[in-house]
Amino acid sequence: MSYKQYFDSLPLKLKSFFQRYPPSIKYSPVSTSTKAINANPFLPNKHPVTQRFHDPKYSLRRMSDVYKLALRYGVEEFLPPIENTKKLFFEEKYNKKTLMKGVLLPKGHKHELKLNEKLKKREEALKKVDELIASKKGSKYAKRVEKMKKNQSIGWF
């Protein structure tokens, strides 16, 4: 496939971008004069007479659209450099992503944190409940509980 055929297979948005900003020109990675040939269309550039910065020719949204299309068609290396922008794309975005504190291992609410301790206390209390009731009701009740336990045990095994 020749370069001409490959260029014709690109989407209209990419074609128009490369016609307006040909990849043969080495674009500046930093802001330059608006009249300079190598003025980067993705960066704000300074007007030589007024010394004021002009907005970039392509906004961040349009730059992102062009970059994503170029990435899909494998021609992103022909785009002007965008290193000093804070915009990250695709793999870079997910590789450099820092997770918020507590996302991987969430701390939980107070009632969730104390749940295991609470269940252990409950089990211990259930084991000691007969002794507690016997101490409050007296020895007569304690003897009755012991008889009930003996009768409940199955001895025919």
From Swiss-Prot:
GO cellular component, one term: mitochondrial inner membrane
One MF term in the entry's GO annotations: structural constituent of ribosome
Family annotation (InterPro entries): Ribosomal_mL59 (IPR037507), Ribosomal_mL59_dom (IPR040922)
Keywords: Mitochondrion, Ribonucleoprotein, Ribosomal protein
Domain of life assignment: Eukaryota
Signal peptide span: none
An annotated GO BP: mitochondrial translation
Subcellular location: Mitochondrion
Family: Belongs to the mitochondrion-specific ribosomal protein mL59 family.
Subunit structure: Component of the mitochondrial large ribosomal subunit (mt-LSU). Mature yeast 74S mitochondrial ribosomes consist of a small (37S) and a large (54S) subunit. The 37S small subunit contains a 15S ribosomal RNA (15S mt-rRNA) and 34 different proteins. The 54S large subunit contains a 21S rRNA (21S mt-rRNA) and 46 different proteins.
Note: Present with 1550 molecules/cell in log phase SD medium.
Role played: Component of the mitochondrial ribosome (mitoribosome), a dedicated translation machinery responsible for the synthesis of mitochondrial genome-encoded proteins, including at least some of the essential transmembrane subunits of the mitochondrial respiratory chain. The mitoribosomes are attached to the mitochondrial inner membrane and translation products are cotranslationally integrated into the membrane.
Protein name: Large ribosomal subunit protein mL59
Species, as recorded: Saccharomyces cerevisiae (strain ATCC 204508 / S288c)
